[in-house]
Amino acid sequence: MSQQRDLIVVVDFGGQYSHLIARRVREAQVYCEIWPFTAPVQRYREAGVKGIIFSGGPASVEQADAPRIDPAIYELGIPILGICYGMQLMALQLGGEVRRGQQGEYGRATLRLADAEHPLLRGLGRESLVWMSHFDSVTRVPSGFRVLGATENTAVAVMGDDARRLYGVQFHPEVVHTAQGREILRNFLFNIAGCRGDWTTESFITRQVEEIRRQVGSGRVLCALSGGVDSSVAAVLVHKAVGDQLTCIFVDHGLMRKGEPEQVVRTFRDHFHIHLVHVDASERFLSKLRGVTDPEQKRKIIGNEFIRLFEDEARKLGQIDFLVQGTVYPDVIESGTETARVIKSHHNVGGLPEDMRFQLIEPFRQLFKDEVRAVGRALGVPEEIVGRHPFPGPGLGVRVLGEVTPEKLEILREADRIFVEEIRKAGLYDELWQAFTVLPDVRSVGVMGDERTYAYPVVLRAVTSEDAMTADFYRLPWDLLERIASRIVNEVPHVNRVVYDVTSKPPGTIEWE
């Protein structure tokens, strides 16, 4: 049995950077989870939490409806680091004073340390650039605390109570704009909380193989294989754990990209030698989607049909007990927690029928996408799969806006093939989180030759991201955009216009539906 790993908990107060804090902790090879602020204090004790980080948040601590945590958390003896709102809440709940400032402090500021040798601040020097984003400020620290650092406009930028191991920083150490932010977080993890740094790809694989074997026993397992990164790596990991007890089912739902079904079958049958059942269910899915335009309804239909189909295949195979899914942490977070509204139902999370007959195996439920890729590389999954851009479970069904038809799918496949081909030629594919095309449910007037046309526009979408929780649109070179647009309107029938989506996330999502 493997040793229990260290656990750091990020308490989510609705801050936009909560997931980023968790990523920074994991980058230091310490396991981290995001919990809602409403989690009972007893849960921390039972989980053996090594350290707690309070996230920032959009509220003012003085608001009546501002998120609060049970003050009993300070009596657990577990080290706590409060960030921005988290520091203000800590100060207020422990008897300090927080006031609305005359002016906010946003952007870079110079932090001046009162104690550069303090375990939390070791290695920073006397001054360091930090990133501020606040209006409220701590004006008096609680009893037992001392001021460890200040900026020109913030008298209490760092505070600490060494006896109780309670600390707060008014700035955001998790963002890249704070020059030595990662050092501060590492100091908290290792100098204050005493973490070992035992969260590695290899330790994850070892632990998951043990857990999967224990969960499955002598049972039989089905894997929902799409050919994407998550399901592919999940299949290889589960196969490592249970071998021939695993059967992979690859469903061609008619919503795949060009040439994708053939590539998936070749890769997993020939390269991995995994038992693979290939089901061509395109007619079944497209008939169910006929006339459906609402994106949420499309996602639910596709999710339901997947499970029903697996149940059909399970009956053919005999007794099947478990279903593997490549659900990742952002899927779980985006599908709703107590501090975040549901943005959209994720195919791997919210689209499952209530009467599902399988027990789920979700080995990557607590991993970010880059961590899944690292697991894949360690397991020997080919780079052409590990390095692939994320593809939604419902496939092109949520990239064809409105009703999904065979004609629209063919248009989108050809446009997408050209776009990705040109992105690869330009050497940009690996720089991007995703690059894909969208077919809106509208037509526009155009002129081709001497004739008026009334055809579809195609939307190009290319974004950079670390984990899909936030994303920036990519500034593609103009000459590349021009070449892509020219090829699409000339080579793809029924398209007369190409547009480029320059929306980041937030306010938009990466996918259009």
Swiss-Prot record:
Q: In which pathway does it act?
A: Purine metabolism; GMP biosynthesis; GMP from XMP (L-Gln route): step 1/1
Domain Glutamine amidotransferase type-1 span(s) in chain numbering: 7-198
Which reactions are catalysed by this chain? XMP + L-glutamine + ATP + H2O = GMP + L-glutamate + AMP + diphosphate + 2 H(+)
MF annotations from Gene Ontology: ATP binding; GMP synthase activity
Fetch the InterPro entries from UniProt. Answer: Class_I_gatase-like (IPR029062), GATASE (IPR017926), GMP_synth_C (IPR001674), GMP_synth_GATase (IPR004739), GMP_synthase (IPR022955), GMPS_ATP_PPase_dom (IPR025777), Rossmann-like_a/b/a_fold (IPR014729)
Record's GO cellular component terms = cytosol
Catalytic residues of the enzyme = 84 (nucleophile), 172, 174
Q: What is its EC number?
A: 6.3.5.2
- Pfam hit, one: GATase
SUPFAM superfamilies attached here?
Adenine nucleotide alpha hydrolases-like, Class I glutamine amidotransferase-like, GMP synthetase C-terminal dimerisation domain
The protein's enzyme class: ligase
What keywords does the record list, in alphabetical order?
A: ATP-binding, Glutamine amidotransferase, GMP biosynthesis, Ligase, Nucleotide-binding, Purine biosynthesis
Listed binding positions for ATP are 226-232
Enumerate the spans annotated as GMPS ATP-PPase domain. 199-388
- Matches recorded under NCBIfam families: guaA_Cterm (TIGR00884), guaA_Nterm (TIGR00888), PRK00074.1 (NF000848)
Q: How does it assemble?
A: Homodimer.
Q: What does this protein do?
A: Catalyzes the synthesis of GMP from XMP.
Protein name (database record): GMP synthase [glutamine-hydrolyzing]
